[in-house]
Structures are given as C-alpha cells and as structure tokens.
C-alpha cells in the first residue's frame, strides 16, 4: 500500500479553500449577461470557448492533491445542479464558494463546525420555502421565451425558438438540439410518431425525387416476430388488396422469400406495401410496438399471447392518415387510436418514469411519452465556425433545460434578486445557540454573492448595486444587460425557481461537508514515496555492515 500524506485542522482547510477558490474563480467569470468567456485547451483540435459553468468546472484538475480535493468537491456542486435542473451551475459554484469562505473563517475563529452546519442547513431549508412562496407559474409563451433568452446569455432568437418549439409539441414533447447547416438557427417539427428505422428495401420507394416511401391512409400490421415465410401473410395481404389501401408492416424483421414477394407485388402494383424493422431491442421493442398499436388503434400480433399471423384480420391492423418512410426514419402521422387509450398509455409510461432508477431509462421513457403525446421538435443551431457551433449548442441546451425547469416549478425574479429578497425575509431567523446563529448569517450573506458577481462582471461596483437593490422591495433589481434598475419580471429577467433552489441546496450541502472537515488524506507524490523507500533500504544495509 502506498504511503499517505495526512493534514489536520487548519492546514487541511487552508489547502482545501485554495482549491475551491481556483475552481470557483475560473467558473464565476462566466456569470450574468456580461459574463466573460473561458478558453479551454484540448489535447487535439481547436480550443473550446465557453460561457457554460459546468464545462469550465469539468476541465479543472489541480497539481496539489489537497487543493484538488477542494476543487473536485465544488465541481460536484456544479455537476449536481446541472443534473437536477440542467442549469444554474455557475450560481451554485458562486454560492458554494461564498458559504465555504465565510464558514471556514468562523471555524478559524473557534466556532463549532457542527453547529455552523446546522445553522446553514436551517437557513437553506427556510430559504427554499420562501423561494416557493415567491415563485409564479410560467405557462405562457412570452415567459418561456424570456427564461430561454436569459439562460442562453441574452440570445433572444434562442428563447423565441424554444417557446415556439414548446407551442408546437407541448410541454411534454421532445425537443432536441442538433448542428445546423447554415448560419441561422432553425426549428424543425416532426408531427406524429417518428422512430429510427427506415425501409427494408429501396424498391418500396414511391417518391423517387425525395427518396421516400409515402403511404396515404395505410393499414399497419404490427408483428413481434421475424417474418420469412410469405404464406403466413397471405390472408392479411389479400384482405388489404380487397380494401384497396396500402399496407405498412412493422416487424422484428422481414427477410428472404417474404421480403422478395412483397417487393414484387409492390412493383407490379398488385398491393402497395412497405416494410420496416420495429424500433428498439428486447423488452423496449415490445413496449414501443405496443405504443404504436395504441396510437394507430391496432393490435400487436405476438405468439407470446397466442396470436398467429395467419389468423390476423383487418380488425387487428392499425390505421393512420399518412406514413412517410425514408432511409433512416419512419413517421406515422395522425394514428386513428382512441384518445382515451392514448392518454391511458401516456399515464402508464409516466408512472414508469417516476419509478425509473437510471437516467438512460428515464430519458427513453420520456421520449416515448413525447412520441405518443405530441411530436418531436428539432432546433438546428447555425454558426459560422465549429468552435462557435459547440459553444452555441451548449447554450441552447442550457436554455432548454432552464425552460423545462421553469414550466415545472415556476419562475422568480432573476439577476440574483430572489435570493436577496429571501435573505432579507429571513433576517430574524435564529438557531438554538450563538454558533448556529453565525451559520445562519453565513448562509444569508452568501445569498448576496450571485448578484455581486453579476455586477462585478459588468464592471460596476457590487456593494453600491447590492445596497440599492436591498433598499427596494418585491421584484425590484438591477438589469445587468442594460445597466438599469427596475422590476425584473417586467423587464423579462426571470430565473426558474427549480434552478435557484437546486443551486442553493447543493451549494449548502457540499459547503457543510467542507466546513466540518478536520482531516485530509492523500497519496504521497511518487518522488517522496520513493525517497522514503530508499532511506529505509539504506538503513538495512548499515545493519548488514555491522554484522560483518
């Protein structure tokens, strides 16, 4: 086992604070509408330019292991805030630094660290309740656009695009961000259900100019099995041909003789058919087939429930107004499934989301809800260079997370004003002893830090602005973009309540752990460990000499 380096008490805390400050100072320059850029060197390719707090935090690794421990713990604050609300990483880092700095001063002055932590926790719990009381619902497009604009560093086009996307696909809809091809940002909306499976044979194409298969009012056969024998399908094909409608086959696979016969029938014009593989794998494929069945009013033909393909009738087939299939995707538009059945299926999947333990499962389930409930919107980010594209894409993703958080828990006045109001309301909060009171004061003082940092990044004097804002009430605050005072909500400076709440809670959680740290242990650097080993060996040799 490698030799360890151990530090205690004040020595440990000083080192830890140094690491916290390095990381926080690098991150906090990005805060606010006039936040600065940070350039990150990459081992290959061009450097990345970003104003995203968590991207900066992730890059920081310090040489001194004790300092690095402090930095990594604050990095955890940024990551947790990002995971919970998708934004507010810089605010969380600024709050953590402020609480840790003031808290460690109090510990150095002889306060009891455990009581300080209890005081901080008490203040934060009360602050969260006050934030909820200040919160106003965010339901209209204008408010959604304003939240998106603020989170995307005052880029109005991004805010408007996100609001438009939410209008088109609903609050539950899936909105994805992709690289665009031009200089302008674009919004693409895919109505209906789309999944990532294309046609099984290019001979199904009936729109050569677009390279797509388009079926108007088709029947849809859903089979949870491989189809290789055409005889299984003859009864269904004959019934569909008599009805004079096209047929879409969605199965685990269609191969060999079955696929060849379908192609020949299509080319001869006997019956218009297209076949695609079912989306997903394993249990997820079964679930997605069931989703499509619910959407189209059909039944999944599955041998597991004793249904055979030869006995399928037109009643077992789903229907839709239109289906478009290209090389990679299939889109089913306006399925004829009953609204009540679709809503029941959506409620069932939402229940599974509540119970899901992994982020991946949760994300996949949310995609399924969106496909059933509304559709998918794609924001295509335009930029002149790849470096700008990466930076802008990160901002759009942040803005998207922020708007979702705003819809979920509402909004409060932005620009750090909500925390200032909360702190002033809690001025009379008291703990069980004097040390806890100091902890409460530490937390309340730290709540001014985001506003002060926003002002500092503008090049103004933080204390002057903070005192002016404290002198006002309600939503009165400082608009750093225009450098004027006024009602933050009227000026469209909004923060999602969830983002502010998460930032405060995670900052206080990690700060409390660091304030109560009394000992730090790390591996000795390799050179020091080698020197120790060499010294031990020399002593042994001296003993040998004595024996001679």
UniProtKB/Swiss-Prot annotation:
One of its GO terms (molecular function) is unfolded protein binding. Changing residue 109 to C: Forms inter-ring disulfide bonds. Prevents ring separation and leads to the formation of high amounts of symmetric GroEL:GroES2 complexes. Together with its co-chaperonin GroES, plays an essential role in assisting protein folding. The GroEL-GroES system forms a nano-cage that allows encapsulation of the non-native substrate proteins and provides a physical environment optimized to promote and accelerate protein folding, probably by preventing aggregation and by entropically destabilizing folding intermediates. Also plays a role in coupling between replication of the F plasmid and cell division of the cell. Forms a cylinder of 14 subunits composed of two heptameric rings stacked back-to-back. Interacts with the co-chaperonin GroES. Can form asymmetrical complexes, composed of one GroEL and one GroES, and symmetrical complexes, formed between one GroEL and two GroES oligomers. The asymmetrical complex is the functional unit. It was suggested that the symmetric heterooligomer may represent a transient intermediate in the chaperonin protein folding cycle. GO terms for biological process: chaperone cofactor-dependent protein refolding; protein folding; protein refolding; response to heat; response to radiation; virion assembly. PROSITE patterns: CHAPERONINS_CPN60 (PS00296). ATP binds at residues 30-33, 51, 87-91, 415, 479-481, 495. It is an enzyme of class 5 (isomerase). During the substrate-folding cycle, the two GroEL rings separate for effective substrate binding and chaperonin activity. Ring separation is triggered by ATP binding to the trans ring of the asymmetric GroEL:GroES complex and avoids formation of functionally impaired symmetric GroEL:GroES2 complexes. Activity of the GroEL-GroES chaperonin complex requires Mg-ATP. UMPylation of the chaperone by SelO/YdiU negatively regulates its activity, and may facilitate survival under stress conditions. Keywords: Acetylation, ATP-binding, Chaperone, Cytoplasm, Isomerase, Nucleotide-binding. It comes from the Bacteria. GO terms for cellular component: cytosol; GroEL-GroES complex; membrane. It is found in: Cytoplasm. Coiled coil: none annotated. It catalyses: ATP + H2O + a folded polypeptide = ADP + phosphate + an unfolded polypeptide. Belongs to the chaperonin (HSP60) family. Each subunit is composed of an apical domain that binds non-folded proteins and GroES, an intermediate domain and an equatorial domain that binds ATP and is involved in inter-ring interactions. Forms a large central channel that appears to traverse the entire length of the cylinder with no obstruction. The central channel of GroEL functions as two cavities, one in each ring, that are separated from each other by the crystallographically disordered 23-amino-acid C-terminal segments of the seven subunits. The entry and exit of polypeptide seem to be restricted to the apical end of each ring. Modulating the volume of the GroEL central cavity affects folding speed in accordance with confinement theory. Small proteins fold more rapidly as the size of the cage is gradually reduced to a point where restriction in space slows folding dramatically. For larger proteins, either expanding or reducing cage volume decelerate folding. A stepwise reduction in cage size results in a gradual loss of cell viability. The modification N6-succinyllysine is found at residues 34, 51, 117, 277, 321, 390. It comes from Escherichia coli (strain K12). The keyword Acetylation applies. This is Chaperonin GroEL. Phosphorylated reversibly during heat shock. The keyword rRNA processing does not apply. The modification N6-acetyllysine is found at residue 117. Its EC number is 5.6.1.7.
